[in-house]
From Swiss-Prot:
The species this protein was found in: Plasmodium falciparum (isolate 3D7)
Listed InterPro entries: Adenyl_kinase_AK6, P-loop_NTPase
Domain of life: Eukaryota
Keywords for the protein's UniProt record, in alphabetical order: ATP-binding, Cytoplasm, Kinase, Nucleotide-binding, Nucleus, Ribosome biogenesis, rRNA processing, Transferase
Protein's name according to its UniProt entry: Adenylate kinase isoenzyme 6 homolog
Organism taxonomic ancestry: Eukaryota, Sar, Alveolata, Apicomplexa, Aconoidasida
Enzyme Commission code: 2.7.4.3
Subcellular location: Cytoplasm; Nucleus
Pfam families, per the entry: AAA_18
Keyword Transport applies: no
Cleavable signal peptide: none
Length: 186
């Protein structure tokens, strides 16, 4: 049975603009839902999984070289199952990895934000990422690691839409693309 509101994943390497886009997207879509009589009581919720993992300590170890925690898929899934009803829909899931998804049927669409490496380098440098961490993320973008993970993990390749997110014009266009997809689902 189709959910009344979809679950979407916004993914991409760190620095591709996921969290900023997700937060604004949530606000825009929820304003649209308020205008519709048939959507009373429904709203989209932004789940920033990186923040949840950090705040709830859902990691198994720390990688000193990359200055990053290695999250536990098991702990994350237990937490999500206990705290949220993903099967009901209404979630904008913001994360750089999709391998945590055990039930692929709970996801209706994946938007993969891509970014040119020169823009990515600048954004990660502004975040004071280590040289090794910047190199690792740029290599992930060049070799399309996240896209390959999605295609390996989800049998329905129509679930994926790639969108480039280098500048403000593309950002605004991406907001519109995703908003329109969500509203057409409803």
């Amino acid at each position: 049975m189709k959910r009344k509101v979809p679950n979407i994943i916004i993914t991409g390497v760190p620095g591709s603009g996921k969290s900023t886009l997700c937060e604004e997207l949530k606000e825009i879509i929820n304003k649209e839902l308020l205008k519709r009589n048939d959507m009373e009581g429904f709203e989209m919720t932004h789940l920033n999984l990186s923040n949840i993992i950090k705040d709830e300590r859902l990691y198994k170890e720390f990688d000193d070289e990359l200055d990053a925690s290695i999250y536990s898929e098991e702990l994350l899934n237990e937490y999500l199952k206990k705290k949220y009803k993903l099967e009901k829909g209404g979630y904008i899931i913001d994360f750089h990895d999709i391998n945590f998804v055990k039930d692929v049927d709970i996801i209706d669409k994946i938007f993969l934000l891509t970014i040119q490496t020169n823009f990515l380098y600048e954004r990660l440098e502004k975040r004071n990422y280590t040289k090794e961490k910047i190199k690792n993320n740029i290599e992930c973008e060049i070799f399309q690691v996240i896209k390959e993970d999605i295609l390996d993990h989800f049998p329905n390749t129509n679930i994926l839409q790639e969108i480039e997110n280098n500048d403000l014009q593309q950002y605004d266009n991406n907001l519109s693309i995703i908003k329109n997809w969500v509203l057409s689902y409803i």
